[in-house]
Amino acid sequence: MLVYNKDNAKEILENKVVFVDFWAPWCGPCRALGPIFEDLSEKYSESAVFAKCNVDDDERFARKHGIASIPCIICFVNGEETDRSLGFLPQEEIELFIQRNI
């Protein structure tokens, strides 16, 4: 799992399809989503790149992406945001979100 931050954002977004999980360690729903995102990143590793961004590590960078609440998964295609999923969702719904964006 890649770490997404201001230092490597351009490099990561050069991939065709990228899913970034914006999270924080103190966020209960984020901690619940973490293992689901990890499992799905392994399942769909051939189709997309998966990364995580701890919003506490760089709040300004998170705000640049319009992150107002977490967890939030953003899908980027060719460097442009195309979709986002906000809040905790069950694995089936996160998987549908991924499938419709790859």
Kindly give the residue locations of the regions a language model identified.
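N-terminal "domain-start" segment that seeds a small globular fold
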Residues: 1-11
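Conserved hydrophobic/aromatic "anchor" residues
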Residues: 9, 22-23, 50, 76
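Non-catalytic, surface beta->alpha helical segment in thiol-disulfide oxidoreductase systems
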Residues: 75-102
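Structural micro-motif
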Residues: 59, 65-74
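Thiol-based oxidoreductase modules, predominantly thioredoxin-like and allied folds used
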Residues: 3-4, 22, 37-41, 45-60
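Short active-site neighborhood of thiol/selenol oxidoreductases, capturing the structured segment around
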Residues: 13-23
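Conserved redox-active cysteine motifs that mediate thiol-disulfide chemistry
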Residues: 22-36
